Amino acid sequence: MKVSVTKNTIQSLKLDAVAFPISKSEKDNALKEVAAKTGVTVALFEKDFSADESSLMMLYPDLELCAFKRVFLVGLGDKPGLDACRSAMASLAKKVKELKLATVGVDLSGAKALSETANDSVDYIAQTAVEGFHSGLYDFNQLKTNRVKELKSGKSEDDEPKQAVEELVLATDAKILSDVKKGAETGDIIATSQAMVRDLVNSPSNYMTALDFAERVKASGEKHGFKVTVFDKAKIEELKMGGLLGVNKGSVIPPTFSIMEYKPEGESLGRVALVGKGVMFDTGGISIKPSSGMGDMKADMAGGADVLGAVEAAARLKLPLEVIGIVPATDNMPSGSAQNPGDVLTTYSGITVEVDNTDAEGRLILADALTYVKETYNPDTIIDLATLTGACIVALGETTAGLFSNNDELAEKLYKAGQRAGEKVWRMPIWDEYDKLIKSNVADVKNVGGRSAGSITAAKFLEKFVGDHSSWAHLDIAGPAFPGMTNGGGSGSTGFGVRLLVELMRNWK
């Protein structure tokens, strides 16, 4: 979808539809302005349009006055903020998609006033609008068409999701044109990177193995200009990454270890390492999961996909920050060669782990990756993302990720980035008292700590593999990354984490 910005009068736009965002507090005045611009009669519909958040009404303009064919009134609610803007634009996109309209405009002449209400900038309002519209348009349609090869190779010239809308036009005033254009361009980059992540996470495991994922990483690096190195099984064995190899023992598909390196052309503000869990399909291994909802376990690589999306977006936005992305990838399968409960693994760090439960596999592969990135790249900050625990969903639901960190400043930055980006996180404790829950009698540590504090003990386990690094955060994205993943709800991937990470990196100091 093409995204463009214009200062031309709204009436002159030859489009299938034009939308007017309207808040409840400004409803009366806004409707009068819409009437003046479109020729619609306010008295015929003003009582029927509530202006509640994401509410919609379609009208037909005076075609002698306007070049566009339809009018949409889009509700922003009482005190519209960034989340309301995203939600409203997503609602609009869904309706436009349903009606199969090809060209759509949005009147953003009021972006300045909206930015003041939302306490943010004009460019961020435009960015948010584009992100929301892209989100509402998204469909996972690759396996319903002849696009299977494109999905696996990532090398098609048209490898973005197929969308009904051909162009989104943001119409605004000349005074804020440059700000709206800047925000629209940024929003388009972030949203398309996030859509790519959603495609990867929604892909069935027979189309997205560890090998397939590595190929997608290579294709993205080649297209967007960041370096990619992929370790094969022989290299992983040479490095003695016992966590990744242990999880992979039950699979006939070899593991991969993908490394992404983005470096800015000019001076760098620092080096950030992103580590993502890449369990391509999680049966639980010998500690096998119930069959109900197991198909959603194709989404257990969402953290790894997020890392690819964030690195890709950083490269496309040309951020002045060095970004290292690491994704250990494998599936977790039961077989005669699979690891057993009670086995002891030696990780890349040399720390030994008692595998008390083979379904706690994500932390095992992350353990190797965390130590590797710390020792190899010495980053200023390490952030890992993983659909790690059902316990985090119990604690925070499906809208919020768990945040665990050994650095108060980093935790605060992530919290604020999440609030602004609409991908919220909430900090959880990682006090030393929890260490006793993962104490092992036969190894240095156990990979699970029992029923209580499951998300916390998982974070405490990971903490051991960053050692003395003083700026680390773990994001448990099990709830928001794939709503319904633990109950067979089948809601599909959200791409949660991409906007959060990009927002953090764009404001790096």
Swiss-Prot record:
The keyword 4Fe-4S does not apply. It is an enzyme of class 3 (hydrolase). It is found in: Cytoplasm. The keyword Ribonucleoprotein does not apply. InterPro entries: Leucine_aapep/pepB, Macro_dom-like, Peptidase_M17_C, Peptidase_M17_leu_NH2_pept, Peptidase_M17_N. The active site is at K289, R363. SUPFAM superfamilies: Macro domain-like (SSF52949), Zn-dependent exopeptidases (SSF53187). Mn(2+) 1 binds at D282, D359, E361. Its main location: cytoplasm. GO terms for molecular function: manganese ion binding; metalloaminopeptidase activity. Keywords: Aminopeptidase, Cytoplasm, Hydrolase, Manganese, Metal-binding, Protease. It catalyses: Release of an N-terminal amino acid, Xaa-|-Yaa-, in which Xaa is preferably Leu, but may be other amino acids including Pro although not Arg or Lys, and Yaa may be Pro. Amino acid amides and methyl esters are also readily hydrolyzed, but rates on arylamides are exceedingly low; Release of an N-terminal amino acid, preferentially leucine, but not glutamic or aspartic acids. Binds 2 manganese ions per subunit. PROSITE patterns: CYTOSOL_AP. Its EC number is 3.4.11.1, 3.4.11.10. One of its GO terms (biological process) is proteolysis. Its cofactor is Mn(2+). Pfam families: Peptidase_M17 (PF00883), Peptidase_M17_N (PF02789). Mn(2+) 2 binds at K277, D282, D300, E361. One of its GO terms (cellular component) is cytoplasm. Presumably involved in the processing and regular turnover of intracellular proteins. Catalyzes the removal of unsubstituted N-terminal amino acids from various peptides. NCBIfam families: PRK00913.1-2, PRK00913.1-4, PRK00913.3-4, PRK00913.3-5. Belongs to the peptidase M17 family. This is Probable cytosol aminopeptidase. It comes from Chloroherpeton thalassium (strain ATCC 35110 / GB-78).
